Amino acid sequence: EEVKEFHEKWLDERRHYDRFNCIDDEEEGVYRLLGNCKSIDCAMGGIRMDGKIAAYTIGSYCPSIQCAFIHIEKAEPEIKGLYNYINQQFLIHEFPDAVYVNREDDLGQDNLRQAKLSYKPIRLEEKYYIQEKR
């Protein structure tokens, strides 16, 4: 419940910057994942500052390929380095055997893409779009 409250606050503060309505599209997926974290074997971590959630992340791990998948990561943007810190600590504590980390889609947002590229990925996957033929 506390994570949902933090997420709603995070959304409200960013909606006026969202030129492509990505936040609204993402919101439904976030709430579904929050509601089903345990049943789909996801791990969740958070950071508290002054007694309140300042960041949270949700991910999963595939041992056969030693890869952690970071599905969601949100943090107070005013706190410099918090995104990096939660990313580091979550991987250390939840997925210490991970050799690879999949940071998933950047939703076509330049700032998100730049942040993900700053981790110096070893490979970027091609994106494909499927359209139903009518």
Label each residue range with its predicted role.
Residues 1-76:
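A conserved beta-strand-loop-helix scaffold within acyl/acetyltransferase catalytic domains
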Residues 22-29, 120, 131-134:
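A sequence-level detector of short, solvent-exposed, charge-rich linear segments
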Residues 43-133:
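Aromatic (often tryptophan-rich) hydrophobic motifs at membrane interfaces
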